[in-house]
Design a protein with these regions (language model features):
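Local sequence-structure signature of Cys/Sec-based thiol-disulfide redox active-site neighborhoods
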Residues: 1-21
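Thiol-based oxidoreductase modules, predominantly thioredoxin-like and allied folds used
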Residues: 3-5, 19, 27-42, 60-62
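Flexible, glycine-rich phosphate/dinucleotide-binding loops
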Residues: 10, 40, 76
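Non-globular targeting/processing and membrane-anchoring segments
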Residues: 24-28, 44-51, 62-136
Length: 136
């Protein structure tokens, strides 16, 4: 897997260790981590709605063909943050900043309460594609 990440990103600090643990369990899974900000040529191949969202995990089969991607966070975490963003609409800039800081703190707790299981499930579904028979 090719990974684009940065140490300052909360989603990276939550999800990259999950991938690293899976790589330790699956000998066929090799992981190469690239700092996003130093590899914009790679990053720009995997934009999300035109943005450089991280982490990006890109998985390949033995032939080097892409079989799937995991980008940013699992659906439960994404829904949580979208809800938090909607709740701060109309607040002052300072109130928004404070509320979003709290939301990110709450998200870290939610990862430990189970959101990381969604990350595992998503990655495993991608990896299972390695073993799917060719469609005729």
């Amino acid at each position: 897997a090719v990974v684009l990440s940065e140490s300052w990103c909360g989603d990276c600090t939550e999800n990259v260790p999950v991938l690293a643990k899976l790589a330790s369990l699956y000998p066929f899974l090799s992981v190469r981590i690239f700092p996003r900000d130093e590899n914009l040529d790679i990053m720009d191949r995997y934009l999300t709605l035109g943005k450089r969202t991280i982490p990006v995990f890109v998985f390949f089969d033995e032939a080097g063909e892409e079989i799937g991607r995991f980008i940013e966070r699992p659906p439960g975490a994404h829904a949580f943050m979208e809800s938090a963003r909607k709740k701060v609409e109309g607040l002052s800039a300072e109130e928004q900043k404070k509320a979003m800081y709290q939301a990110r703190s709450d998200l870290r707790k939610l990862y430990r309460q189970g959101f990381y299981h969604e990350t595992i499930s998503m990655i495993r579904k991608i990896l299972e594609k390695r073993y799917e028979p060719e469609n005729s």
